[in-house]
Each structure stands twice: as structure tokens, then as C-alpha cells.
């Protein structure tokens, strides 16, 4: 007998599993299809984010930073450690334990909320039917009133550097190194490349980042990207801009990479090479020819502002649709879609989705950059506050970076918050909340912030917008 559901979700990443749980909470009979399995062959929920993305990379970032601090900075606090060593296998094992715990947690949440997990590859057929292909090749077809496509993305492959997951690896392979490579190359100076490059640089690798663009972190505010490049270079990342990789040759346990820059053709040899040039949507074999769902030339599914496809009752969320490939975007899209299935008037504010790079210092922003606003002809006032003037940052021996608040010169409404420094990912969320409610810089300046805290830097930057900062000299006079 054919199984029937109110909602069938294809993909159990941060978009899919959140949508499935929310649907079940709202009383909808829900199933979630996922093909990903762990090393033991068991169903692994959570998608790229939990298994080989957001979570494991943060585990390695935190472990590597603690190692670097113990080796270089504990003496500032009066702590003598002797020789500091890193057990890479133990570090990677800790990461794996965290992943197992969290993916198991999603399974527990499915059970608690009554979501049916189905292991296999999901494919949308005509009439909102979904074909599930099991690992043994058998298939079954289930029916749904509503289908949510949340199949995620995978690393982009480039012909000049074919991944073998041995010497040349993608972001997944870079999480599994069992030893620190002496010479590490990274193709791509984006979020993934900088984070993974930072991990292994802290542990002693000589890291070279090859970026085809001439501009570093183009999406970030110019002041932030300049500070980030300076700081990361000081930490040991050799960032080569305008370096377009044209070829690679693996020789045993090393790889010779050929790239071109302003000086012509160059060659450089690495022990490991990480290809981190972005991700592409996973829509291959997701849709039957008669499904009715439309995709573009790059594999993205066409949707409207509410993630509805061209087929009534079929939706797509997360990395398979246009926009930033962010876990939190996918999750909120999933919730919005389910709310709308239930008849609620839910929507998302795509202008206020925070972006974060988990290097050290962290880099985070929400809203528009100063250069973008100037290009639009918007007059702005800007306030900045350096963490070097923060008592809490000094106490933590973590004073690099600053907070920057941008406000409309006419209305004082906050249009952008940009942070590079300690806990930037947490601080920028305060800016997102303020901007969601149309807060002015003056409003932020009138709020009482706990002392001593890092968040006071946001307070002071907001005050500085109108020349009222207390703990730093004001560029703008009141």
C-alpha cells in the first residue's frame, strides 16, 4: 500500500530537517528522505552542515585555536605549559564525536516529533509523488500533498585541480587530515578556504591561498576586508590575489600547481591541496522529466519570494535555490514554507541574513556595506569602535579588530553592522535584531549594555555614528 503524507521533505540538512520538525509540530503527517550514511552505514541526518561542514569545521577551528593560544599566549596570563603538542588524530576524533552526537540528536528530535525518516535517494515525480531508491536498488513511491526540495549542495570541481581525496581534496577531505601537511595550498579565499586554511596554519602548516579575484572578501565591507587580510597574513596565510590556477600535477605525495598572475605563469608545490572554490546545488536526478519543476542553467530551482516552485504544492529551500548558501537561511526558509502550507502569512527578510567567517578574529556582518550604499547614492554616517579600547577584550588578550555601524545620514536608521574581532558572530546578531525593528543609531546608543562586555563595542560604535562615543575620540563632532 502506498504511503501518503501531508509533507514529504527530500533532504535532511539544516533546511530539510528543520522544515520536517516544524511541519510535524504543526500537526502535519511528515516524512523526511535522506540518503547520506555515516562510516557505519547508518542513516546520518543533518546534511553537509552537521556531517562535513559547519559543525566539524568549527570543532577543528576551536581545537586549533586553543593549541595556538596554549603555545603562544598562555604565558601572558602567567601560565607556563612547557612543550605543547597536538595529537591530530585525537583532534579529528573529537570532531567526529561531536558530529555523531548532533546527528543522533536530530534523529531523536524526529522521533519525539513524529517525523518518519526514510533512508534512500528521493526523486520528485509528476503529481507530487516521490520515488525513493534504497541502497539495495529497490524503489518505492510515496505520495504527498506538499513536497519540499532541500537536497543541498556539494563542492564545485574544477578541471585544473581534479580532487582525488588524497593529495588534492575538497572541503570534506580537508576535515580528515591525520597529520599536519608541511606545505598546504588552498584554492579559493572564500569562507571555506580561509577557515580550513586557518586550522592547519595554526598547527604549523605553511599555507598559501590562491585567489583568482583581485579583491579580497569582496562581499565584506572594505574596511573589514582590509583588516582581515592584514591580520590573516600576519597569522601566516600567504594570500595571493589575482592568482588563477590553470593546472596541477600529482607526483607521489605532493602536487605541483600552475597558476597565472600579473607576472605571468607560476609554479608552486604542496603536500596537500584544498579546492575550495564554492559549492553547487544538488539537483541532478532530483527531478523526473515530467515533474514540472524548472531549474536554471546552473542547476538552481526557480522559486518565488516564498520558495514556491512552478508546481503548486512543491517548494524548494536552501542551497538548491538562489541566494547565499547558508544553513540559517535554509532553516528559516523551511519554517516559512511550512507556515505557509498551514495557511499562515509567513515571510523572510532576506536583507538581514547575517554572514560569518569563523577565522580568528571572527568576521561577521549584516545589512549593507559602506561601498554598496555609496554606490546606491545613499548618504551615510559611520561609527567605529576598536576592540583595542575595550576593557573586556583587553582582559581576554583579544583586542584585534573593530565594530562598524553604518546609518542613514538623513534618518539615522541603521543600515549595516560589520564586525571583525572576538565573538563577532554573536555581536552581529544584536545588530540584526536592532535592524529588524528599524532601530536608529541613537536608539542603540541609548540602550544600557552590561559592563564589561564585548557588546559595549557595538554600543560605542553606535554612539560614534553621531559623534557621541565615550571611550574613543570622535571623528564626527556633535
UniProtKB/Swiss-Prot annotation:
Name used for this protein in its record: Dihydrolipoyl dehydrogenase
Gene Ontology MF terms: dihydrolipoyl dehydrogenase (NADH) activity; flavin adenine dinucleotide binding
Example of a GO cellular component annotation carried by this entry: cytoplasm
Active site: 451 (proton acceptor)
Binding site for NAD(+): 188-192, 211, 245, 276-279
Compartments (UniProt record): Cytoplasm
Alphabetic keyword roster: Cytoplasm, Disulfide bond, FAD, Flavoprotein, NAD, Oxidoreductase, Redox-active center
Disulfide bridge partners, by residue number: 49-54
Top-tier EC class: oxidoreductase
Record family assignment: Belongs to the class-I pyridine nucleotide-disulfide oxidoreductase family.
The keyword Nucleotide-binding is annotated on this UniProt entry: no
Catalytic activity: N(6)-[(R)-dihydrolipoyl]-L-lysyl-[protein] + NAD(+) = N(6)-[(R)-lipoyl]-L-lysyl-[protein] + NADH + H(+)
